[in-house]
Amino acid sequence: HHEHGLRIANLASFDAGAYTLDGVTRRTGALDRMMGVRRTGRREGLKSSYARIEDAADPLLEGIGDTDLIPNEGALVEIAPDAQRVVPLTLIPPVIAHSGATISIPEYSAIKETTDIPVAVRGTHGKGRVVYFCNQPELLFYRYGFPDLGRVLANAVRWALAEPAVIDVDAPDFVEATLMTQPGRRMVHLVNFPVSKPLNTGWRHMGRTLVPLADITVSLALGSGERVREARAATTEQPLAVQQD
């Protein structure tokens, strides 16, 4: 949830707002009206299922590339979206290679069924924007680190905020960037954090071979009337090249 000015950006997923503080299921989810959805059911055990891309030009799918599918698993809340809601992703039920198969490789497993069951919806509420994921993309991204899941989440945040990014870093995707703001100063912390193998624990091991990086470009949005006086590396005090628009 983010509020700026009179606009509100709200992202939610799965069971957000579905329970009271005492853990009792609500008859109507606390966020359902804002999200523009009505809960109609639930699906469990969606291993080897997918989200089908309905519109590759949708802002939630920017940068996804040449694919029609995004991996999915776990549970999903079935909803009936309001007519004003856009549905960029729909559910493809579990793809099974054959009866009793424990693994299904999409290249060798025919997709026999598609649905119009939403996986994600977006729209407006008041003067703000809202996005609701019926599944748990943040958990799946945490568990598997699949890049497309991260891109969809990041795109949802950008679209909902409807404002320019305050920082943009042109670097390999394993570089972590953190921005801290203080009066008259911006501090950008970059961490070269390669991973030597994929993990499903959510914890990333440091790469065994650390390769130095160079020529990373950091772009920052300045406030009204602000100008950059100097930029330097905090560890060495070495001046850095600056270009101001």
Outline where the language-model segments fall.
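Solvent-exposed loop and beta-edge segments used for protein-protein assembly and interaction
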Residues: 182, 210-212
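Residues that form or immediately flank small-molecule/cofactor binding pockets and catalytic motifs
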Residues: 12, 92, 236
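Accessory, solvent-exposed terminal regions and/or long lumenal/extracellular loops of proteins
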Residues: 194-197, 201, 207-210, 221-227
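A glycine-centered loop/beta-turn motif at secondary-structure junctions
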Residues: 5, 9, 29-32, 59, ...
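Short intrinsically disordered coil segments
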Residues: 148-149, 204-206, 233-236
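Solvent-exposed beta-hairpin/edge-strand motifs
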Residues: 84-89, 157, 212-237
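A glycine-rich, often tryptophan-bearing local segment used as a flexible ligand/cofactor-contacting loop or short
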Residues: 1-67, 73, 154, 158
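Solvent-exposed beta-strand/loop surfaces of large extracellular or lumenal domains
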Residues: 102-104, 108, 228-244
